[in-house]
Swiss-Prot record:
GO molecular function annotations of the record: structural constituent of ribosome
Disulfide bonds: none
Region (Disordered): 138-165
Coiled coil found in the keyword field: no
Record's subunit section: Part of the 50S ribosomal subunit. Contacts protein L32.
Alphabetical list of Gene3D superfamilies matching this protein: Ribosomal protein L17
GO terms for cellular component: cytosolic large ribosomal subunit
Record-level GO BP terms: translation
Family: Belongs to the bacterial ribosomal protein bL17 family.
Alphabetical UniProt keywords: Ribonucleoprotein, Ribosomal protein
Domain of life (superkingdom): Bacteria
Biased composition (Basic and acidic residues): 138-158
Protein name: Large ribosomal subunit protein bL17
Length: 165
């Protein structure tokens, strides 16, 4: 009898497997490229393609707000980071608007030396260039630093009581 063969178990129990998949999908959409073993990448690929398709459904102009909210909530079941969800719906889905699948690709690398396991790279097919990604991250960090600095100066001016002479 062939039982327990519908899901790739990845040598983990259900909770650990789900956490692994969610974290790797989040990393894929955040960095647009991840490196891992072939078995994990094949599982992650199918989940990622489904999430991109779900995000693309929100690009339809006459879609009801309830359906848009439902799509976003379904994606947020897998991706817990709100910034990554926003990136998926506003940036990644628009890049793949004209494609009907094949949003990701798995590239094979040389087997890992320590345990000889098959390693590969999973990446989005229409990736932004590395220089553009680094520039965007730097701008984001600078904006966050500026906001923190303004917050600190506001706290200092509020917390220092005026001295009596």
């Amino acid at each position: 009898m062939n039982k327990r063969n519908k899901v790739k178990h990845l040598n983990r129990n259900k909770g650990h497997r789900d956490a692994l998949i969610n974290n790797m999908i989040t990393s894929l959409f955040k960095y647009e490229r991840i490196e891992s073993t072939q078995a994990k990448l094949k599982v992650i690929r199918s989940h990622a393609e489904k999430l991109i398709t779900r995000a693309k459904k929100n690009l339809v102009a006459d879609l009801k707000p309830e359906v848009q909210l439902h799509n976003k909530r379904e994606v947020m079941k897998r991706i817990k980071d709100r910034e990554v969800v926003v990136k998926l719906f506003e940036d990644i889905a628009k890049r793949f608007e004209s494609k009907n699948g094949g949003y990701t690709r798995v590239l094979k690398l040389v087997n890992r030396a320590s345990d000889n396991s098959e390693v590969g790279i999973l990446e989005l097919t229409s990736r932004k260039e590395r220089a553009i990604l680094l520039k965007e991250r730097q701008e984001k960090r600078e904006a966050q630093e500026k906001a923190r600095e303004e917050k600190r100066t506001a706290r200092k001016s509020d917390s220092v009581p005026a001295r009596k002479k």
